[in-house]
Amino acid sequence: MKINLKYISFTRVYQSLLLSILIYNNPINSEAQDNHYWAQQYGATCTLMGGSMIGGVNDNSAIYYNPGILGFIDNPSLSVDANVYRMDRVMITDGAGKDMNLNSAQLSVYPQIIAGMVNLLKKSKFRFSYTMLTRNHGNILMNARYASGGSGSGNPEVTSFVGGFDYVNQLNEQWFGVGAGYRISEKFGAGATLFGTYRGQSYQLTNYVQEVENIDSRNVFRTQTIDEAIKYSNYHLIGKFGLSYTSGAFKLGATLTTPSVRLFGSGNVQRENSTITVSEDPSDMQNNFLIMDRKTDEKAVYRHPLSIAAGIEYFTPKTRLSVTAEYFFRTDPYYLLKPASVPFVYPTSYSDSADYKPMIDSYMHVEIATRPVLNAGIGFSREIYKNLTILLGASTDFSSYEDTKEANEMLSGFGSFDIYHLATGFSYSLVKQSVTLGFTYAFSPSENIPPYTVINQGPAADEAHLSSYSYGIILGYTYYFSRSGE
């Protein structure tokens, strides 16, 4: 019997029934956000302008986009921007077999950013800022069930057949930052932000098929099961450095974001894969197989990549047009979790097999790698009435997922589909405050993929159809305490 922990299947010679389950050599972003660096933007105005604010951000979200601009912000202010409502939808047609769709539709409400400015030194060229922002947030929940009896199957030999697929992937990443900017001259500024970050992810996949068949007046029970779960948390430090320059009607900016420096982190991982037959005839059970293990409080390592960004903005008293691009470098393969693997294996002969020992030794490993990504965004704003401004934005959000020998596509939010973001809204400004309201839409072009699993009987699906989209409402409020020097 050949065991393949990427894809397990068995075919019954006496009946054209294929039971197959796709499993991964390591457990699973989330929603797509886990592989997408531009899934979140910050500040209502910046979000609705496609995040294209490296060159011309003029509110306290500069602590994230470009701390080199902080020295030019004269209004110390407290800003609270939130995704009041967001719906994320992932659809995989035939994802669990022919006519067995996998769908997830989740509502989220969470703070996008809370940020403020502080003038510690009056009439100084220094400006200080602080922030708390949601860097990543994702939630996918999918399940599918299939059941049939002997009469419904069209074959009197089959007594019953049951299949199930349950998938949960939740991600939460929070960044806490303090930043400082210095106005070197009336045109040139520099700044830096230090972020302390928390990242937590919880993933669970349960996939099984069960069959009871009557053969020659005896019942034969067959089952295949995949059960795997990961839960981890990581704490890091990340630095961002920024430069800004103004020349006439143009603003330019550039930033560098350092790779993360791990402080500490831990996680749990458990897995089970089995193919079991129970029968009065020993020959039916010769291919039985079971492997399982569980590890807790293991060292967990997650890495954020080095990135560089540049942006330019053209501005007039009533109009802004901005463009930004950011390049994220590759991260070489590394282990999110790499516990010593000493699983229970049956038959025990597999433990001593040269063919299967490497697979068994790496059974609990969770490997990650990211490919380089270049994202770009464009934003436009125009005052259309007294203090009322329309905002428009668009941006790319390409996937960084890279398949490796021990990678788990499911842990990474279904792999490598790209996302495109569109946004529009309005901002209304008063002397001491401003309010911004807008809408966002994100989508992934549909693509054909192999089915993630097969939990039903009948003709097998050759391919599945993956698509996703997201709707959001952005509400921003900024209160200006006083201008510098007032």
Where on the chain are the PLM-derived regions?
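Cleavable N-terminal export/targeting peptides
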Residues: 1-36, 482-486
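Short regulatory "switch" loops immediately downstream of catalytic or recognition motifs
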Residues: 1-2, 19, 23, 87-93, ...
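Short secondary-structure transition/capping motifs
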Residues: 21, 101-106, 166-169
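N-terminal, post-signal peptide beta-strand-biased segments of exported outer-membrane/organellar beta-barrel
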Residues: 28-134, 260, 415-417, 443
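Outer-membrane beta-barrel porins/channels
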Residues: 33-47, 111, 117-486
